[in-house]
């Protein structure tokens, strides 16, 4: 798979596939003719190896709960070490079904009701609701844009921390500004 090339330019219609990005435009924006630039939902085909693995699994007639193989954790550890020189212990890896549920879990785990959680806008909108729906206090630490370059306002971040923040929900790489 390492030498395989993918066509990132092919136009593939997703209309009629229950795609929130395309089929949901009328519900979300009140019209269908808007460009869906609001969500990080890719418009290129999945790699053939991924499609083949999903088909092979789907051919088994029972869809029960999955117990990830232990090798998955080693793969995650190796990837983090190779790409980021980050050594992560096996017990520090928690698999989740998606980022939004993880944001809610983090707000619940690291701050109590009414306690502060810092979010750095502009950011993917579920960061805000993860805090407010968890009955935590939303503390905003807006990023600063200078000549098209976004950065953290560390002085303001310190003030947020001094206001009793118990957690910071960090988006990295940052969506939508792209900083790591």
Region roles according to the model:
Residues 63-180:
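Conserved core of the PLP fold type I
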Residues 2-98, 105:
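N-terminal small-domain helix-loop-helix segment of the aminotransferase-like
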């Amino acid at each position: 798979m390492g030498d395989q090339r993918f066509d990132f330019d092919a136009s593939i219609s997703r209309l009629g596939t229950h795609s929130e990005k395309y089929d949901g435009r009328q519900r979300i924006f009140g019209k269908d003719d808007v460009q869906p630039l609001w969500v990080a939902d890719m418009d290129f085909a999945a790699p053939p190896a991924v499609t083949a693995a999903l088909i092979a699994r789907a051919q088994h007639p029972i869809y029960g709960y999955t117990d990830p193989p232990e090798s998955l954790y080693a793969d995650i550890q190796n990837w983090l070490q190779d790409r980021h020189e980050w050594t992560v212990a096996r017990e520090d890896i928690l698999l989740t079904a998606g980022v939004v549920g993880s944001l809610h879990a983090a707000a619940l785990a690291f701050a109590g009701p009414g306690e502060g959680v810092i979010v750095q806008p502009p950011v993917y909108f579920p960061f805000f609701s993860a805090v407010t729906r968890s009955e935590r206090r939303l503390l905003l630490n807006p990023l600063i844009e200078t000549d098209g370059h976004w950065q953290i306002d560390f002085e303001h971040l310190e003030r947020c921390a001094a206001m009793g923040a118990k957690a910071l929900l960090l988006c990295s790489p940052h969506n939508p500004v792209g900083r790591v």
